[in-house]
A protein has these predicted regions:
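Histidine-acidic metal/acid-base catalytic patches
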Residues: 52-74, 79-178
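Active-site acidic/histidine proton-transfer and metal-coordination neighborhood
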Residues: 1-71, 153, 157-161
Length: 178
């Protein structure tokens, strides 16, 4: 769950928007909770959203809503833009962290960009993370993908190569940080 992509007011988030956000999250959490569903709130970078752009903001709103089934959903692509550390948001979230999109800084092959994977996995190990690590690769060899996520340069890898190579990298990192 995250705010609308590319929808901006042109101003900083207002108190009224924050209140509305909390009201909506409370209602969604209550509805989902009746079915035992946990909702992950994903901070999205400032170029795509202005409502919640960092883990700290999401955690503050989760605390305000105070619903046990609201959690943090991190995405390493957005973290690379908005966070100063890949370790600290993981530690700050602790058991509230339930889901992570594993994406390289350039949305390409994991391990070939700027994401500090060792810092991320060290944090995950320290909090005894047992949520979902989800590979999120994008290749413009997939029709429509370039327009959807602004991949304007040709991909170095096709979708299958990207998935296989990135999955191998995730497995290697997971084994190194057990």
């Amino acid at each position: 769950l995250h705010s609308g992509i590319g929808v901006f007011s042109g101003k900083q988030r207002t108190r009224e928007e924050e209140n509305t956000l909390c009201e909506v999250w409370a209602e969604v959490a209550e509805y989902a909770g009746r079915s035992g569903i946990t909702i992950g709130i994903e901070p999205i970078n400032r170029y795509e959203s202005y409502m919640c752009t960092s883990a700290e903001e999401v955690l503050r709103f989760i605390k305000r809503v105070d619903a046990p089934n609201l959690s943090l959903h991190l995405d390493t692509f957005h973290m690379n833009i908005e966070e100063t550390s890949f370790y600290e948001p993981v530690i700050a979230a602790g058991s509230r962290l339930r889901h992570i999109h594993m994406t390289e800084s350039n949305r390409g092959m994991l391990g070939e960009g700027n994401v500090r994977w060792d810092d991320l996995f060290r944090g995950l190990q320290e909090i005894d993370f047992n949520g979902n690590l989800v590979l999120e690769n994008f290749s413009n060899s997939v029709p429509g993908m370039a327009e959807a996520v602004s991949l304007w340069r040709p991909s170095k890898y096709n979708a299958d190569e990207l998935a296989k190579g990135s999955l191998a990298f995730m497995r290697k990192m997971t084994c190194e940080h057990q």
